[in-house]
């Protein structure tokens, strides 16, 4: 393997396939209804004209539309952020956001609202702020930019870190939150609707800054790690540790380790118990319904749905949809997960067996080409297709960018793909993360993950030389338990304490950890 691209999954944040993005039609202003041309419409256009007219004209006030969530994220400012000269109230221009002046106050309120539902990360900030465990840490962050991650970013700063931040997804940034962070003095380079060039430029501005050299990476998808290793290998060797929170990013790290190219220790947060059992499961259980409802106003009762993948994300999606009265099918490659799905009451099928009849397709695998053009050719008209995995490669969107198909944007993050005979499918967020592109995610679940990320950064940064080698590690069990304990007061939950006799009988320390590393919760 001669180059990094051979050893990693292709760009999960932006995706190599997005190089053809300009082939699609230009987005229409959501507040304007464009009169139809005086030509004969296809049957699909006739069937959906009423839906499109309502969504185009009313999306700004519709309580379930994505516009109602993004707020000022869709501000209609056509001037590219990189061409603007902006300064915050302190005179700093070390940032690049959509519009700091018009949005930062609203973004600050969003962050304050999120803090109320994030007790764990706030408790950690209060307990550790005086000790400054991240003093002298210089962290490059590449994650989703929303109110919840803003709470994490400001917590890291409060714990002593210097940070620079970019987005890991071109559609998930809340512009008003990015503006609020910029106003508070945090160097942030992110806005909703970045191009591919913008995406990599933003990460580069974070990594390669004047008089500032990163020594830690907090990644979601592996893009900051990928760029730094490929473009700044000497700088990469000076990094003390990497913290990665996504399936795709962890996969890339293991590939680098296997190829002998991972020269720094990395912490796999994605497979920590507090991430998989709470964020992946409970967060996805709520956000999949919110995403579909906001973007399509779909009625769930009686709908046939296929969920591709029955890991923790797939489990959450399937259980939520089943609870709303959907008939849910599961596709799986793993016999253990397939058996779990079967015993949970779901029918496990191959995608081709049900693709002609289902109303909704949800991917949650972290793999590529799970739903390809052949499948979409067989879908019935009006089928909704969306992705809950990290990567934008699960749905073969490039296979839909052909001359015989027509793309029509009907809402922010909602496209109709129309076949010559009039059939159409509804593609959400162009195959990217639907819950972060079309809705929001529960702040409480993100608090658990954020506290886990913060502790992982503290552990790697303060670890004595030799404790961690150039490999990928799981978060120590003791830290998982500590993160959980930070959130128990919210429920007025009281833990039972072991007696000395009980602790001796079980061979445990009374303060934990209480389960071995191989225990499956």
Swiss-Prot record:
Function: Might play a role in the regulation of methionine metabolism possibly by binding and inactivating Ahcy.
Pfam families on file: AdoHcyase, AdoHcyase_NAD
SUPFAM superfamilies (UniProt xref): Formate/glycerate dehydrogenase catalytic domain-like, NAD(P)-binding Rossmann-fold domains
Residues bound to NAD(+): 246-248, 311-316, 332, 388-390, 435, 515-519
GO cellular component term of the entry, any: cytosol
Entry binding sites for substrate: 220, 245, 275, 279
Cofactor(s) needed by this chain: NAD(+)
Subunit structure: Interacts with Ahcy; the interaction may negatively regulate Ahcy catalytic activity.
Family in the record: Belongs to the adenosylhomocysteinase family.
Superkingdom of origin: Eukaryota
Any Gene Ontology biological process: one-carbon metabolic process
Organism for this UniProt entry: Drosophila melanogaster (Fruit fly)
Cofactor: how bound: Binds 1 NAD(+) per subunit.
Positions of the UniProt region annotated as Disordered: 1-92
Name assigned to this protein: Adenosylhomocysteinase-like 1
């Amino acid at each position: 393997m001669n180059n990094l691209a051979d050893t990693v999954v292709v760009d999960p944040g932006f995706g190599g396939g997005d190089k053809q993005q300009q082939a699609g039609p230009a987005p229409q202003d959501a507040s304007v209804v464009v009169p139809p041309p005086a030509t004969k419409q296809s049957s699909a256009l006739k069937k959906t004209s009423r839906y499109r007219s309502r969504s185009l004209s009313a999306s700004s006030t519709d309580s379930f539309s994505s516009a109602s969530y993004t707020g000022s994220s869709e501000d209609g400012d056509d001037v590219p952020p990189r061409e603007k000269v902006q300064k915050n109230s302190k005179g700093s221009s070390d940032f690049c956001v959509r519009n700091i002046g018009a949005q930062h106050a609203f973004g600050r309120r969003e962050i304050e609202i999120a803090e109320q539902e994030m007790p764990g990360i706030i408790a950690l900030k209060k307990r550790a702020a005086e000790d400054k465990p991240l003093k002298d840490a210089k962290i490059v962050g590449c994650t989703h930019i929303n109110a919840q991650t803003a709470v994490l970013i400001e917590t890291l700063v409060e714990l002593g870190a210097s940070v620079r931040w970019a987005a890991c997804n071109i559609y998930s940034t809340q512009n008003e939150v990015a503006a609020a962070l910029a106003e508070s003095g945090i160097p942030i380079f992110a806005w909703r609707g970045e191009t591919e060039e913008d995406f990599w430029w933003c990460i580069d501005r974070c990594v390669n800054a004047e008089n500032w050299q990163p020594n830690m990476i907090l990644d979601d998808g592996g893009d900051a790690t990928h760029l730094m290793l490929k473009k700044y290998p000497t700088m990469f060797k000076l990094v003390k540790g990497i913290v990665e929170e996504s399936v795709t990013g962890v996969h890339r790290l293991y590939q680098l380790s296997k190829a002998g190219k991972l020269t720094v220790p990395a912490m796999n947060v994605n497979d920590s118990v507090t991430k998989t059992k709470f964020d992946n499961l409970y967060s996805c259980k709520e956000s999949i319904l919110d995403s579909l409802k906001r973007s399509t106003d779909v009625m769930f009762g009686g709908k046939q749905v296929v969920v591709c993948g029955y890991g923790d994300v797939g489990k959450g999606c399937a259980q939520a949809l089943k609870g709303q009265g959907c008939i849910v099918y599961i596709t799986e490659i793993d016999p253990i997960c397939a058996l779990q799905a079967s015993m949970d009451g779901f029918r496990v099928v191959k995608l081709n067996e049900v693709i002609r009849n289902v109303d909704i397709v949800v991917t949650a695998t972290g793999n590529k080409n799970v739903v390809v053009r052949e499948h979409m050719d067989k879908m019935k008209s009006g089928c909704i297709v969306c992705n809950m995995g990290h990567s934008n490669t699960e749905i073969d969107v490039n296979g839909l960018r052909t001359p015989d198909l027509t793309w029509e944007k009907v809402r922010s993050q909602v496209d109709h793909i129309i076949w010559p005979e009039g059939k159409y499918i509804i593609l959400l967020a162009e195959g990217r993360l639907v819950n972060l592109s079309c809705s929001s995610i529960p702040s409480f679940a993100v608090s658990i993950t954020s506290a886990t990320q913060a502790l992982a950064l503290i552990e790697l940064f303060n670890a004595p030389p030799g404790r961690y080698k150039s490999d990928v590690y799981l978060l120590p069990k003791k830290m998982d338990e500590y993160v959980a304990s930070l959130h128990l007061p919210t429920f007025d939950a009281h833990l039972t304490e072991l007696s000395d006799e009980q602790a001796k009988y079980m061979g445990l320390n009374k303060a934990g950890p209480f389960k071995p590393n191989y225990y499956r919760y």
